[in-house]
Amino acid sequence: MIEQFILDQQLNAMRIAGKKIGAGRSPERTIAVFNPYSGKQIGSVPKATLEEVREAFAIGAAYKPTLTRFERAAILNRAAAISTRRLDEVAALISAEAGLCMKDAIYEAGRVSDVFLFGANEVLKDDGQVFSCDLTHHGKKRRVYTQRSPLLGVITAITPFNHPANQVAHKVVPSVATNNRMVLKPSEKVPFSAILFADILYEAGLPPEMLSVVTGDPREIADELITNPHADLVTFTGGVAIGKYIAGKAGYRRMVLELGGNDPIIVMEDADIDEASTLAVAGSYKNSGQRCTAVKRMLVHHAVADQFVEQVVAKTRAWSFGDPSDKKLDMGTVIDEPAAMFFESRVNEAVAQGAKLLVGNVRRGALYSPTVVDHVRPEMLLVKEETFGPVSPIIRFKDIDEAIRISNGTAYGLSSAVCTNRLDYITRFVSELDVGSVNVREVPGYRLELTPFGGIKDSGLGYKEGVQEAIKSFTNIKTYSLPWA
């Protein structure tokens, strides 16, 4: 039983510099966590006080990490081994608190191990640069060198519900790799995976002062997390509105904001329709459609639209969903019943405005069926705004110019997918789509845990995540020069 596992592992307590804080508080000072499918409470976490949040920052700020590259790599490699050994436990916890099906939860648990391994490998690389100074007529016989150092203060990390473990990994691992200190606040809807993640790192040998996990009500502690004097950088993944609030509140400190997306898959007239429809369906429904890089708009050339729609409908009907603990199913629930109700209302609104519902839009609690809606117009809210669930809205276009115009016609700019074999089309999409990533004949969300990832416009400020890029964001660069004969 997952409830007993949570108690046995003491996941009902925060981790402030490794210490278990806050278990057993009164109901008024705890947050209940529910299984989205059953609706039953599986545990609770404490509501941190402002004093506890400040203590976490003070401990981090006072501690000066001295881990060598070898020691950091060893810790991350041991953490990878532990997380791999405990993969079934990690996956079961993800599924229980987020409602993700076991297929998706197991995949995410494997990704966490990958992040640990990539982080360990990156630690061993020295990315310093060397500049010879005799490059101009007034140059000198000197060389300028660069080196990266940890931030002077503490990193604040705030993570969302949709990837309870992997989002945490992408914040914490680069922090460990760069000898930084971090205070992590996971989503109050899915806190247990983050606490278990911290325990894995402590077991692997991480000095506990380098990582604290605080849980609580954002209305009480969010401003302190953003504005604490010891916070040198705020890294946040989540919705646009909250990201912009952080940007306005944080003041003179660094920010890495990975926000929402409204990612298209664009299917041209020369595309392999079987391949394109398979990618479209997987991109729309994996992780219950709750990914910033999920397919949220299907843009299809009118010449192949009917064939594409037929295949998408057939593959959607075959996409099994239900109890997330059933390892045979392709999809579990969305995060909670209000989210499912929101998706249902968005689809109903589009249908009332002339779109055609082909399959789905069935809701039971937090369970929401894979849904296909055809003849959607770009101005409908279903596709104008981000619909963060398993909905496949189909928009038909006449040529590449219109496809690019529609794709760029929202406030978002995260990722995209294009299905074509024509190089002239590919080069135009790469050049003209206002997004952070363009994947050819692949889903918008495809990436390695190592590669740069992030968006522009309302999807982010252009800073990238991914282990390599986060390491750069989490460090200060210093130059020094020496005489060189």
Regions found by a protein language model. Name each.
Residues 1-141:
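N-terminal Rossmann-like NAD(P)+-binding subdomain of aldehyde/semialdehyde dehydrogenases
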Residues 39, 72, 94, 116, ...:
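Residue-level signal for inorganic ion chemistry
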Residues 128-275, 397:
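Rossmann-like NAD(P) dinucleotide-binding subdomain of oxidoreductase/dehydrogenase enzymes
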Residues 41-48, 61-66, 156-157, 265-267, ...:
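Short, well-ordered beta-strand elements within core beta-sheets of diverse protein domains
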Residues 36, 50-53, 69, 87, ...:
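Residues at or immediately preceding the N-termini of alpha-helices
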Residues 38-44, 74, 231, 266, ...:
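Conserved C-terminal structural/oligomerization subdomain of aldehyde/semialdehyde dehydrogenase
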Residues 61-64, 80-87, 91, 98, ...:
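Structural signal for hydrophobic packing residues in well-ordered secondary-structure cores
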Residues 241-377, 400, 440:
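ALDH superfamily catalytic-core signature
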